[in-house]
Amino acid sequence: PVNLISIDELQDDQYVVPVSGMGAPTVSLEKLPSEIELTNPLQELERAFGKKADVIIPIEVGGINSLYPVGAAAKLHLPILDADAIGRAFPEAQMETFHLHGLEPEQVAVGDEKGNVALFKPINAYWSEYMSRALTVQMGGSASVSDYFLAGKDVKGSVVNGTLLLAREIGEILMHQEDYDDVFKALLDRLNGFELYDGKVTAVTRETKQGFNFGTAQIEGLNNYRGKTFSLEFQNETLVAKEGDEILASVPDLIVALDIESAFPITSERLQYGSRVKVVSFPCDPQWRTPIGIETAGPHYFGYDVDYIPVEELQGKEK
């Protein structure tokens, strides 16, 4: 078992280190991490800083990166913080709330399943991304990263709190659907989300390059959305949801394709022809709606010539 601690239990002088995976999710479906891959980067940072980590934190609460740090915490017998540095998942390393608060990585360690470990000193979070990504590509397209070594006092106020318990709560809803008249409504209500459309995936184009999965899913409307065509565009995570050329939701808000039968999420690497989905969107943490948050992870950064508009405004309603 892993001990989960709250932000209130974190001491100012405790050292907090993230553990995360980097790379294209399609690669990690076949190239599984080893035990040493999860722990080597953290231990390399301990040697570099001459200090021991006291607490592990997830960089993001989305996908496999919500579980990698749990595995590392179990192996190293360290507690894990009920918080993360995104409040969702993002594809690039500078897209962390630490960066939004002026905390830049001093040293970064990247490791693979074979035991290779690289340590470098980036000048800022963007260079941390560039260099980590290059190493990840050379390590086969997926690797593990520890990119900060922070005192508890710096972590407080620069993370998204309570996200692991929130993830467990969402899991409980999905695992006990018999308790709800409408599980989709339960999920949307809990996360202040919006239904965008129901549809069937008619085509998926996907390319793995530069350490990412890039692609587009074309979707034909179902149920109340028959006769309409939609699309999802992704770089590991979904960036925009469209009806024709109209944007229905965009980063930094969260866009999720839910299996229309099971209500479980379908990640971008698992979307395929014939998938029947309910596409929904949830507002991001308020830290991402600041000017630096939008600059770091808004639609302009990903090459879209549109300004960020919160999903609740795009959908014309407040929750």
Predicted segments with their positions:
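Oxyanion-binding "anion nests"
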Residues: 168-221
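Conserved anion/nucleotide-ligand pocket segment
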Residues: 113-163
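Catalytic or ion-translocation cores adjacent to nucleophile or general acid/base/metal-coordination motifs
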Residues: 3-8, 78-116
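Glycine-rich oxoanion-binding loops at beta->alpha junctions
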Residues: 10-54
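A short, small-residue-rich loop immediately preceding and capping a beta-strand
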Residues: 52-65, 79-81
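A structural-propensity feature for long, helix-poor, extended segments
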Residues: 14-21, 95-135
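C-terminal non-catalytic interaction/assembly regions of soluble proteins
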Residues: 204-319
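Short glycine/serine/threonine-rich phosphate/pyrophosphate-binding segments
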Residues: 38-39, 59-70, 87-92
